[in-house]
Amino acid sequence: MHWGGHFRTHKKLNGELLTKAVNVGLNYMNVGVENGVNKILALMEKGQTSDDVSFFLKSAHESNVFYNANWIPGYPKENHMDFMLQLKFLYDNHKYFGNNGLLNLMQSTDILDHTPLDVYRDDFEVSKEKTMLNSWVSNDTKNTLMIRHLKAFFIEVMLKSFQFTKEGDELIGDDFSYATPKEKGGKPPY
């Protein structure tokens, strides 16, 4: 029997516990790591630090569990230095993705009605009036949909240079390897 699901990073999810879970059928984890910068993780109220995220990535890598790490570039209040720190975090931790980890690059953050980002727009420095292409804009207009997509593009270029695996038929090409689950004939360590 195989099982998997949605997870969050936690200090108790160490290599030993994850290896035990793999031994009883864990074969897929969708994990909300979201970012590698402490400031952004605090704004998201994730209750984790970049060290916690790095520890989880290392533990998942060592246990050979297949995981998909969700990543959000361009979160409200993210500045250029935060983005550079994200790139450094990915550079420092790219070795933990190997053949069993994927980075799910989420192109942009939407602000849905009645969510904390909507209710506390002033705190997140998001304009209440200005939009561009029907998407939110920061008060200083340094965070727009186009900037968020450009950041995602830069991360894609970096991922390509590190030969990260990518998931999805639209990303298959000479430059990307495709991670296939074990049930569909994928290669170990799935």
Outline where the language-model segments fall.
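Short beta-alpha junction loops
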Residues: 73-76, 109-111
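A generic "cationic amphipathic patch" detector
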Residues: 18, 44, 73, 80-82, ...
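C-terminal accessory regions of radical SAM enzymes
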Residues: 81-190
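Conserved SAM/AdoMet-binding glycine-rich loop
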Residues: 1-68, 73-75
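Active-site glycine- and acidic-residue-rich loops that bind
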Residues: 11-12, 76-86
